[in-house]
Amino acid sequence: MKLTCVIVAVLFLTAWTFVMADDPRDGPDTAVRGGKRFWKARNEMNSAASKLNKRECLEADYYCVLPFVGNGMCCSGICVFVCIAQKY
């Protein structure tokens, strides 16, 4: 009996999730229940202002922790316990 109730509850919640999910093909006017609000928030996001996009790198002669090429910490990409400048 308990197992049956759990199965029914899981099926109900799964169906509810699919019914209430936002369909990106719908425009902001055709969405159900406050779809405009979510659509507007999605469009107002400024991904260029994200701190995750701004990675600072270490200049030459700074300690770089991970000694291998291409670790992303050094601007040159070469690290042998200190960042090594690349000569072009």
Curated annotation (Swiss-Prot):
Q: Keyword Cell wall biogenesis/degradation on this protein?
A: no
Tissue expression notes: Expressed by the venom duct.
The entry's localization annotation reads:
Secreted
Q: What does the UniProt entry state concerning the protein's domains?
A: The presence of a 'disulfide through disulfide knot' structurally defines this protein as a knottin. The cysteine framework is VI/VII (C-C-CC-C-C).
**Could you confirm whether the keyword Signal appears in this record?**
yes
One Gene Ontology cellular component annotation held by this UniProt entry: extracellular region
Q: What is this protein called?
A: Conotoxin MaIr34
Give the similarity note.
Belongs to the conotoxin O1 superfamily.
Matching InterPro entries? Conotoxin (IPR004214)
Primary location recorded for the protein, binned into one broad class: secreted
Q: Which GO terms describe its molecular function?
A: ion channel inhibitor activity; toxin activity
Signal peptide (residue range): 1-21
Q: List the disulfide bonds.
A: 57-75, 64-79, 74-83
Top-level lineage group:
Eukaryota
Q: Which UniProt keywords apply?
A: Cleavage on pair of basic residues, Disulfide bond, Knottin, Neurotoxin, Secreted, Signal, Toxin
Task: Cite the Pfam families for this sequence.
Answer: Conotoxin
User: Which residues are the propeptide, according to the record?
Assistant: 22-53
